[in-house]
């Protein structure tokens, strides 16, 4: 059973699969060296990056993330402001301090990080890390970053965890999830809470979701108060701060019945601009789609009622349960199934979370989730210049509004839906697997080859 602590992870931008996952892989590799007593024998480290990680790795800061992981950092706690200086030092000296400064090794600028266009056999996002003693490899590991900041090594790819804790309601489909809700009389969030209580204490759950909400609020606040241009060759101007000023200062806008949409857009833009700048964000379920779940909860907070611990906990539980279904039965990796697995899943999650807060039945929550995905089927992932900016940032805003609409449509429906959530999840996965690789986070097709950098 996937814990919702894993669905909502605090990390850094711009990508969960290409930044958060690779940093975790680097950290895991150096932890292995320490555990096996090999660290002091290492004289050089080399990294090979494959597939989508390679093709869009520079724009997604994959190389930087791996280096910071090897240095002993974790995405949730790394000092973001220290990263540029640390990377400059590594590039200048060709030396890398491993494991929080415990041991220094060679890391040549031209040979320490090698990018390969081909894929490794098990997934589109693959990397190999090698530790050398002089001319001999003394430890090597292959990792796959499978979306949402999740990583798995080659030996455990496709395997279920052997030490899983038994939960009271071990659902693997929406059908099973609804059966548990109907047999117990629990709401969706209430049922999922019982599963989480088998994995974590009540205090741990309260503290974790409190930290997630605080991180989201801080991210929105930074994003809507920061001006300038986002990093990279596109030089995309930040828009959230200007939109906020317009909304706050204009009397004409305040009387516009569509005003709420502008606020939702602003919340989403704020989060995704922070992500694009390498800021602190929450995977929901990925970084590329990290603005949607926050924007919809911020909408509820500003236009329906102030968000309390009970409200954000119920929201995250319902949204996270839907995200877990996609993770278990399909994919949340843009490199595997296109943007429908990122923005599509986030839209589905946010629609479900909002419906839960609005008093929807478990069946209506699943209808909202289904609508949120159905109208994102086939969505491609074609980041311009390999960066999580165009079309990603604006796409989060559009999907946030779509999620709110999906929740409202689900709750006002009087007829039985013809498409189930399980069927739309199955369809999304099959559609993604049929999708040409040009449209799965390789920057080899779509907008990525039509939009030129200055």
Model-derived features: where do they sit?
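Conserved phosphate/anionic-ligand binding catalytic regions in large, soluble enzymes, centered on
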Residues: 8-26, 277-296, 337-347
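Accessory "access/gating" subregions that flank catalytic or transport cores
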Residues: 200-338, 446-454
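C-terminal regulatory domains involved in ligand/effector binding and gene-expression control
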Residues: 75-253
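Hydrophobic alpha-helical bundle architecture
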Residues: 307, 318, 324-397, 409-418
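Short, mixed-charge aromatic SLiMs
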Residues: 44-57, 89-97, 315-328, 370-383, ...
